[in-house]
């Protein structure tokens, strides 16, 4: 799960997916290093907590080339981060691991999960709802619980 700073969308996506399956290894990262080592945004922590998910112990980290070897699938939250991840890929196999997360629910639409960072508190509920729905699709696709 990859967004820009790894404090809003991707930690929330990680927490949601982890809450739905203990069989998946899920991590999150940011393409930028603004917040490396910091906790998720308090608004993400609070919206997750509202849904009985604890993401407070997560710490932001920057996406690296090693993630291509470590993970079978890499989900980008938006087109900009997708492009940044792809630019780090060394071959087609690595490129093929990267997908816009909302394409799992809305195939080939290339929709982005909006960044709620500069928005209002209710934007985080909207992001939670989007990510919760797409995480259900991911669980169905890979048939893991």
Predicted regions and their residues:
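Short beta-strand scaffold positions
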Residues: 1, 76-77
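Phosphate-binding/catalytic loops
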Residues: 73, 83-145
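Conserved active-site segments centered on acidic
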Residues: 1-70, 140-145
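Short amphipathic alpha-helical surface micro-motifs
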Residues: 57, 80-84
């Amino acid at each position: 799960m990859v967004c820009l700073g790894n404090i809003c969308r991707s930690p929330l996506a990680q927490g949601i997916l982890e809450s739905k399956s203990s069989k998946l290894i899920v991590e999150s990262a940011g393409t930028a290093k603004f917040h490396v080592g910091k906790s998720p945004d308090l608004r993400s922590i609070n919206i997750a907590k509202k849904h009985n998910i604890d993401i407070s112990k997560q710490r932001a980290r920057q996406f690296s080339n090693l993630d291509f070897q470590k993970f079978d699938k890499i989900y980008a939250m938006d087109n900009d981060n997708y492009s940044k991840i792809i630019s780090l890929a060394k071959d087609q196999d690595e490129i093929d691991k990267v997908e816009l997360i909302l394409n799992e629910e809305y195939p080939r639409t290339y929709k982005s999960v909006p960044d709620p960072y500069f928005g209002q508190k209710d934007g985080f509920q909207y992001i939670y709802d989007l990510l919760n729905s797409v995480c259900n699709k991911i669980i169905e696709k890979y048939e893991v619980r």
